[in-house]
Amino acid sequence: MVSKLLLKNGCYFLFKKLFTNRFFCSKSCLLWIWLNPWYVLFSLGFALIVFNEWMAYAFLPLRWPTLKCGHTHPCLKVLFVADPQILGEIDETAFARWDCDRYLHRTFMVAKSYAEPDIIVFLGDLMDEGSRATAAEYERYLARFKKIFSLSSFQPNQTIFLPGDNDIGGEDEPITKIKVERYKKHFGSITDFSYSHLEFIKVNKMLRTYPDVPQEKKENWLRFVLSHIPLLGIPGTFSYEALNELKPDFIFSAHDHKSVHLVGNTKTGERSFIQPLVSNRFAGHHPSWIFFPPSRDTVNEIIIPTCSYRMGSNFMAYATAYIDTQRNVIHYSLLTLPSRLLHLFSYLFFFTICFLVSIIQYLSHLCRQPQIKYVQIRSD
C-alpha cells in the first residue's frame, strides 16, 4: 500500500513538475517552434518515413492471427495470392508501377516468411494489362512479376498459377489462342495437381473448361477446385456442370476483390448461403475460421480478396489454409495488409503543411522588412 502511494505521489510530482515548468508552458517554447519550424518538420517527416516505409511492414505479423492446425496432426500449408494485377505501361506512370511493385514485394515476403507455405496458389489476374500487352511488354511484365514474388526461390511443384481475365481476356477483351498459349508457355498448362492427401483441380470459367478426373475421390483426400471467377457467385450452366462432375469439397476463387464465404449445392450449382469474411468474433475478432468437411452434395466456396492497393478495395490480404490432413479440417486465415493509399495521403498532407509553412515564413519575412520613407527637402 505504501509503495503504491509513493508511486502515485511520485508520478503526480513528475507530471506537475513537467507541465508547470517554464519551458513547456511558457511562450518561449511556442516562440522557438515558430522561429524554427523546419527542425520540427524534419523530425516529423523522418518519423513519418520510418513508420510508412519500415514499421508498417515489419510489425505486420503482430496483427495477424496465429496460424496452426493442431499440435499432433500433420499440417499442409497453402498460401493464396489473389489478383496482384501488377500495373501496366499503358495506363500507369513509372512511379505508380514502382510503388505498387514495391508494396506487393514487401508484403508478400513478410506473408511468405510468416506462413511458411508448402504450396503457393496464384488465383489469376497476375497482370493488369496482360491481355493487351505486346510481346515485348509481356516479357517486361513477366520479368517484374518474377522479381516481385521471387519465383526463382521456389521449387517447380511449389507454385500453382491460374489465368484471369486480365491475363488472357474474357471480360473486356476477347480471348484468343495466342493469349492462351502465351500464358501456358510461361505459367504452365497443368490442370490438376496432387500433394499429400490434397487434390487441386483448375477450372477455367472464361474458357468453360475443366479436366476430366474421376468423380470418386480417394479415401481421406480433400478435393480443392481452383477458379479465378467464383463458381457460386452467379449460378449458371457451367457452374452446375463443373460442380456436378468434379464434386469438390472446397472452392477457392478470386476476381471480386472481396472476402466472402459461399455455400452451394453440387447437384444444382445454386448458392444457399453467403457470408462476408472480415473478422470472426469467436476468434477474438481475428480474421480466422475453421472449416470442416462439408456434408453430402454441399460445397464451400471461399472468395479471396486482392493483395493490391490499386484495385479500389479498402480490404487487402493474403490468405492461408492450414489443412489437418488426418481430420480434413481447414484452418483458414487472412493476413490483412496496410493501406498504402493512406501512407501516400499522409505524405501529401505533410508536404502541404511544409508548403504552407514556407508561405507563412515568406510573408512574415516581408512584414519584418524595414519601411523606407523618402522625405522631400525643399531648396530655397
Which role does the model predict for each range below?
Residues V2, W34, L41, G45-T66, ...:
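Binuclear metal-dependent phosphoesterase catalytic core
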